[in-house]
């Protein structure tokens, strides 16, 4: 019989975190997250999510053996913004067993009802960089660092058997950085925008120069995704958390901002793919692991774009075209990059998906966020 227990001791926290590493230890596509990041998600004193919202964590046991885990969340600002009563689940991992899946999801449903929620949505995490959904396509491809989730194909069957249906899909696109070209229509629109002079491209030589613009980047980040399915207004501490984590790996020379009247209205955030180093580090982040990450930054031939934003006020001035032109310029800067990915674009971002196809991108991974009414 499967037993579900709350994670309420340090020993159980450790079992919760370690279970994923054991489950995927022989999976070549899996990229282990940094363990301290997962522990931070479980710590109300460290993670800004808990400034406004709540979460609990559960383990599934078969006898004394851990066979699954799940986090149950309520994001109060998201619900307030969307006028919803959603509970969410995340950090969902388990063996291929329907009884285990049912027990974990039943516990989340019970937890949600106790708090007045009427629907469960997920996987959906603690912040915008956590990655959305259960992967339903592209399992043969390596996970893009920890900017998306990776799971075995059977997860889809288990949640759908439970009664979950699709809420929204997030696609990730493959692109050959050295072959991608700016379409004539895009180039013309970008040229007109630059000639008008109202939109200016800002470049950076190093992180010291970039840091001077971080306050403006924070503001632009919060305003660029208001039309996205997953959007809710981030608090200052959440924005600081997201931006500071993103800038650890970002390449200053390739990062571009669009500025209008000294205000950042668009940006492209490129990240060198250090997945191979993460795999070797196995969740650790000591001096040796940091050296390994720094070395991988200099030699990886993969680049990831997981932060392309444009404020609505700039879209009518050719901002969209300018964003794609500078994205392509960024990947052309360094011939070392032979592979690229644009990570997790929601299907509700219809125009952006069309733009990516026009640029020659190929959708090659799909993550599905599920929903189920529980009222």
Feature roles, as predicted:
Residues 20-62, 70-80, 204, 209-309:
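A conserved beta-strand-loop-helix scaffold within acyl/acetyltransferase catalytic domains
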Residues 74-77, 308, 354-357, 364-367, ...:
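Alpha-helical subdomain
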Residues 68, 168-169, 266, 365:
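A structural microfeature
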Residues 149-230:
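Acyltransferase donor/substrate-recognition loop-hinge adjacent to the catalytic core
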Residues 2-3:
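Extreme N-terminal starter segment of soluble prokaryotic enzymes
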Residues 126-128, 178-180, 207, 273-275, ...:
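Short, solvent-exposed loop/turn segments at secondary-structure junctions
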Residues 79-163, 281-359:
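Acyl-donor binding region in acyl/amide transferases
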């Amino acid at each position: 019989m499967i037993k579900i227990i709350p994670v309420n001791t340090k020993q159980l926290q450790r079992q919760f975190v370690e279970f994923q590493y054991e489950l995927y230890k022989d999976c070549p596509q899996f990229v282990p997250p940094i363990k301290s990041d997962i522990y931070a998600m479980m710590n109300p004193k460290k993670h800004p999510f808990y400034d406004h919202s709540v979460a609990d964590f559960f383990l599934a046991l078969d006898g004394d053996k851990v066979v699954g885990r799940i986090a149950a969340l309520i994001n109060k600002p998201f619900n307030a913004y969307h006028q919803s009563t959603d509970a969410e689940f995340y950090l969902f991992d388990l063996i291929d067993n329907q009884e285990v899946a049912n027990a974990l999801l039943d516990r989340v449903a019970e937890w949600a009802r106790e708090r007045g929620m009427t629907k469960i949505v997920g996987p959906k995490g603690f912040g915008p960089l956590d990655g959305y959904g259960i992967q339903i396509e592209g399992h043969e491809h390596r996970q893009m660092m920890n900017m998306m989730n990776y799971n075995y194909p059977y997860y889809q069957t288990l949640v759908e058997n439970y009664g979950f249906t699709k809420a929204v899909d997030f696609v990730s696109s493959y692109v050959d950085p050295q072959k991608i070209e700016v379409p004539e229509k895009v180039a013309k629109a970008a040229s007109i925008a630059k000639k008008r002079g109202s939109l200016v491209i800002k470049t950076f030589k190093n992180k010291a120069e970039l840091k001077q613009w971080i306050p403006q980047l924070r503001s632009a980040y919060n305003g660029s995704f208001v039309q996205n399915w997953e959007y809710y207004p981030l608090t200052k501490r959440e924005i600081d958390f997201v931006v500071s984590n993103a800038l650890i790996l970002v390449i200053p020379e390739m990062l571009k901002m669009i500025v209008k009247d000294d205000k950042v209205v668009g940006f492209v955030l490129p990240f060198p793919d250090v997945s191979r180093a993460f795999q070797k580090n196995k969740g650790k982040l000591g001096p040796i692991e940091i050296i390994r990450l720094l070395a991988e930054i200099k030699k990886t031939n993969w680049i990831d774009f997981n932060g392309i934003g444009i404020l609505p006020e700039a879209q009518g001035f050719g901002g969209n075209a300018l964003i794609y032109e500078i994205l392509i310029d960024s990947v052309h800067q360094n011939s070392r990059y032979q592979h690229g990915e644009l990570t997790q674009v929601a299907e509700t971002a219809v125009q952006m998906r069309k733009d990516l196809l026009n640029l020659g991108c190929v959708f090659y991974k799909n993550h599905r966020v599920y929903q189920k009414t529980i009222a």
